[in-house]
Amino acid sequence: SVCLVHTPDVIIPSEDCNFEFCGVNFGIIQTPGHSSGHICVVTPDDVCYVADTLLSRENQDAKLPYALHHVAAFASRRKMGETRHSHYIIAHKGICPGADFPALVRDNDALILRRAEEILSMVQEPTSFSEINRRVCAHYKLLTRQPRRSLRFERNVRFFVEYLVDEGYLEMSCEDGATLYAPTGKHFT
């Protein structure tokens, strides 16, 4: 907490646990992926706030779902899919009844895999990241004249490209000091 701008009044533990706050017991579930220190919180009335671990049904058409690290996000969604709570509250819109939650987890995974496969299909030959980004933005009609917004799109595309490299769908090479990405031949099943 030495590097923080403000001193926190309560430090939330960095592991899965029960945590008392103002005399009330909450469950803490570590779910990195969307961000490195992302957590879910379970209230005493058995409601789980999943925050950005998942997209709600209302957001299943997201063009470029954000995750800092897609492999960690998949693991966190699987972990949450094994939990059983009466309801789940999802950031940016949505409450999911507990009985429907496992299907929502599967649908979130399917959306990310679908987007990754679509992005992979846009790389047929060794291609620079800038060109991949341009193709993805054109494909999803993410057209803007605002640099800050285009940087957000670029960030989201980069995390998908990193996922494709990490999982062996794309390989990197260098040419004249520029990193190029090419398909390895591995396909989504």
Description of each model-found segment:
Residues 22, 44, 175-177:
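Structural motif
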Residues 20, 40-42, 182:
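Short, well-ordered beta-strand micro-motif
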Residues 15, 35-37, 177:
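A generic structural signal for well-ordered coil/turn residues at beta-strand boundaries
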Residues 121-189:
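C-terminal regulatory/interaction regions
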Residues 25-116:
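Metallo-beta-lactamase
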Residues 1-22:
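Active-site HxH/HxHxD metal-binding segment of metal-dependent hydrolases
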